Regions:
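Positively charged
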Residues: 1-164
Length: 164
């Protein structure tokens, strides 16, 4: 990673910073062109996934969580691979399951959240190609959580309740 070119992005913790909270609760802007800035943000998120893998166990991030309100997410596809989705949208969802959920943007809180058991999403990869991702169970929850971030929705808004 070229540290000289890397944008200075920081994890935004909504509950601690009113400016960050406002940014996180607004819809992110669609990516119009996959340019150097978009690639840089994706690279930064990839780096953050590497850093967090052994820590709090991040399985995904949305660009807006690092101060970039663009429609881009990264998520752990399997134990060795991260995937980037640009302008992702949920095209279908099925069933629902209620489970415990946490969020990096609202640290030290745990919520009970209902999410679809299965989702199908469509977006672009970094080459600008349309890709479809199907997720069930944990992957469905993760995809919906990250896409909610892009829509300005945090788990405290949709939770059935907060545990702590």
């Amino acid at each position: 990673m070229d540290e000289g070119k890397m944008r200075k992005l920081l994890v935004i913790e909504a509950v601690l910073d009113p400016v960050a909270d406002k940014l996180l609760r607004q819809p992110s802007q669609p990516v119009k062109t996959i340019d150097g800035v978009v690639r840089e943000v994706a690279e930064f998120l990839e780096y953050q996934m590497t850093l967090q893998h052994g820590g709090r166990g991040a399985s995904g991030f949305a660009a807006v969580q690092f101060g970039e309100p663009i429609r881009l997410i990264i998520f752990q596809w399997d134990t060795l691979t991260n995937r980037v989705l640009i302008n992702p949208e949920v095209v279908s969802e099925k069933d629902s399951v209620t489970k415990i959920e946490e969020c990096f943007s609202i640290p030290d809180h745990v919520f009970i959240v209902a999410r679809p058991k299965m989702v199908k999403c469509r977006g672009l990869n970094l080459n600008g190609e349309t890709v479809t991702v199907k997720g069930r169970d944990k992957m469905a929850r993760l995809l919906k959580h990250e896409i909610d971030h892009l829509d300005g929705i945090l788990i405290d808004q949709i939770a059935e309740r907060r545990l702590y």
